[in-house]
Amino acid sequence: MTTSSIRRQMKNIVNNYSEAEIKVREATSNDPWGPSSSLMTEIADLTYNVVAFSEIMSMVWKRLNDHGKNWRHVYKALTLLDYLIKTGSERVAQQCRENIFAIQTLKDFQYIDRDGKDQGINVREKSKQLVALLKDEERLKAERAQALKTKERMAQVATGMGSNQITFGRGSSQPNLSTSHSEQEYGKAGGSPASYHGSPEASLCPQHRTGAPLGQSEELQPLSQRHPFLPHLGLASRPNGDWSQPCLTCDRAARATSPRVSSELEQARPQTSGEEELQLQLALAMSREVAEQEERLRRGDDLRLQMALEESRRDTVKIPKKKEHGSLPQQTTLLDLMDALPSSGPAAQKAEPWGPSASTNQTNPWGGPAAPASTSDPWPSFGTKPAASIDPWGVPTGATVQSVPKNSDPWAASQQPASSAGKRASDAWGAVSTTKPVSVSGSFELFSNLNGTIKDDFSEFDNLRTSKKTAESVTSLPSQNNGTTSPDPFESQPLTVASSKPSSARKTPESFLGPNAALVNLDSLVTRPAPPAQSLNPFLAPGAPATSAPVNPFQVNQPQPLTLNQLRGSPVLGTSTSFGPGPGVESMAVASMTSAAPQPALGATGSSLTPLGPAMMNMVGSVGIPPSAAQATGTTNPFLL
């Protein structure tokens, strides 16, 4: 043991260094030889331990900071760091990249020994190589893969030798075979490989007994590891003991340039570097083929997924187009159906919806629903046939559908309620009966066709006839009613003309009322038009009561009869010159008061004047004779004789 080794061990004990630190100190010592590979392998294995990794790296950085005569510490630390980067944990390379400036500063390391030799050049070159390796990522990966493969082989060598009780010499990574050591060295190490088959002299060939080297490689292993079924150089392999030919070990060593660690599975291992390269290329090709197959499968899946997405997208685009194309035939079909509907003739194409000669099948311009067809006014007038049919059960339009007759006073329709005010006070149908006949018989109603009813085949001709007979019916009705006391509305000439036509589809009041027709006085529902002299307030509501007192329509032109006091005080009777002289009213009053006999006669005379009053008034109203003269000629007053 050298002095430096003793001093190092003393420092380890005093400073209480750990096992990892002790190994790093030994690998980076100041001895004139380099660090052993076995020691560096142990340190590399310790880098996978977190605690040991920190201890190893701290000691390595401490060694890199030395200078001067301790240049070997720096150089060996760089060598150890290079080995740890390639075979140790990946954290070593990561930490070296983080502290790469500490390695770059070593490119300027200077030291010249006593002999004038520049020893710092070794440190400078090693630091440059290490910095270049750390900066080149691809090169670092390749170097690391190669170093890990070599380390695995070294581990297999140690395992194979340990199974055959073969140990390495202290301080050397080479096996203690006879190629480099004497037989005494095997005894110190624990025996020779051939100790299990007899003496080494009998098991080895003469060439081996002389200590000739088996090969040039340091990794040469015994043949028993490669061929376990054949005893290594035993007598069984040489039954006759003929050693003239070289043994199998010598022949194998002569042909093999790079022997491998052997076992039962070593039969498949390559024997040469060419076979190794061939197997490596074959493995790479197989791996590439598997990767390409996986890539093809993945691309096929992606392609099928893309095709499915495109198909789904096309389907979603086609569906709205089909809907749009499908809606066009429906619209054209509806248009064809509308065109195929029968038209109502030339009258249906008129632009004016309010024309008097409306078509038979005219539609409602307001879009309202059509009412039941073939319905008529249940209260027809005695003038003409209705020009349009009206629904009696529809919306009550008595206040709004009071149209004005053609060629007449616009306020004539509102004058009729005043002429029959007495009858409307007790008749609930008065408002309808006084307005509808005039509106229907002698005028065109603006909204008569809005109820949706359908006319008969002769309605167009009826409109033409009613327009001609409107003036005659309006002018003839007052003259007929004034000439007769009780005219029959159903025996008038216009009604006879209208009844001569086929009206099987029309309804009559009797058919509308049915068996209850006898309960309704139809004469009271038809009234005579009011004389034009009378007028009403045009702003009065149609349903409001009349302002004038109820008047008997049959006694409109009859004045009130004169009483006895009026007859006595009237100067007309006394001053009449048409019928001769006679006593005055005063003489008649005196005679009636003084004589008792003439009182019954006067009473009879007075009673006879009362019933004659209406006839005389009627005669006055029709002929125009003054009432005073009519009374003088129509009575036999004894006082006037």
UniProtKB/Swiss-Prot annotation:
Domain notes for this protein: The NPF repeat domain is involved in EPS15 binding.
Binding-site positions, a 1,2-diacyl-sn-glycero-3-phospho-(1D-myo-inositol-4,5-bisphosphate): R8, K11, R25, N30, R63, H73
PTM comment, free text: Ubiquitinated.
Name by which UniProt lists this protein: Epsin-2
Modified residues (Phosphoserine): S173, S192, S195, S486, S570
Residue list for modification Phosphothreonine: T508
Family named by the database record: Belongs to the epsin family.
InterPro entries: ENTH, ENTH_VHS, UIM_dom
Function in brief: Plays a role in the formation of clathrin-coated invaginations and endocytosis.
Swiss-Prot/TrEMBL Sequence repeat ranges: 352-354, 364-366, 377-379, 391-393, 409-411, 427-429, 537-539, 552-554, 637-639
Cellular component terms (Gene Ontology): clathrin vesicle coat; cytosol; endosome; intracellular membrane-bounded organelle; plasma membrane
Domain UIM: 275-294, 300-319
Keywords noted in UniProt: Cytoplasm, Cytoplasmic vesicle, Endocytosis, Lipid-binding, Methylation, Phosphoprotein, Repeat, Ubl conjugation
GO molecular function list: cadherin binding; clathrin binding; phospholipid binding
SUPFAM superfamilies: ENTH/VHS domain
Subcellular locations according to the entry: Cytoplasm; Cytoplasmic vesicle, Clathrin-coated vesicle
Tissue and organ distribution: Highest expression is found in brain. Detected at lower levels in lung and liver.
Region (6 X 3 AA repeats of [DE]-P-W): 352-639
Gene: EPN2
ENTH domain location: 12-144
Domain of life from the UniProt record: Eukaryota
Low complexity composition bias: residue spans: 408-421
